Amino acid sequence: MSDNKSINPICWVPTVYFAMGLPFVALSMVSVLMFSDMGVSNAQIAFWTSLIMLPWTLKPLWSPFLEMFKTKKYFVVATQMVTGVAFGLVALSLPLPDFFCYAIAFMGVIAFSGATHDIAGDGVYLTELNATMQAKYIGWQGAFYNLAKILTNGGLVYLAGSLKDSIGIVHA
């Protein structure tokens, strides 16, 4: 960052890495439990959730092209917004008759956005912090990524179970 606009990394490293962990865990683990509770067949769950995880595997294919269009910081902010909106659309699609098709489509958007966020977030971390600062904040990076995993896999699953018990469930 330039000297006149320098922001302490403690203000952005935790949130960036929390935002990296949340979509990955929500799509790879929590969605499986949700679809299973909603009556989707195991074969469909396995196929579609495996497919929507591909963007994280294919990150190296589009990472070189990101800065041709906008900055890494732009992609960090934009992908966080896209991911948030797409999660909202997943939630809104669940009561619909063809919820599975819509939910998978929105989750595909989340996957591409989340993988792009990972690329951009790591890029910002590497370019904005020197080696000493990177070493200083590596613990924060890992802690908040893992906190996202815990809250998503524990807290979100608990919340979903509570809502299912109080509101009911939509069956596929």
At which residue positions do the language-model features occur?
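Helix-loop boundary and gating motifs at the non-cytosolic
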Residues: S2-W56
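Intracellular juxtamembrane helix-capping segments at the cytosolic ends
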Residues: S31, G114-L129
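C-terminal ends and interior cores of transmembrane alpha-helices
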Residues: V77-F99
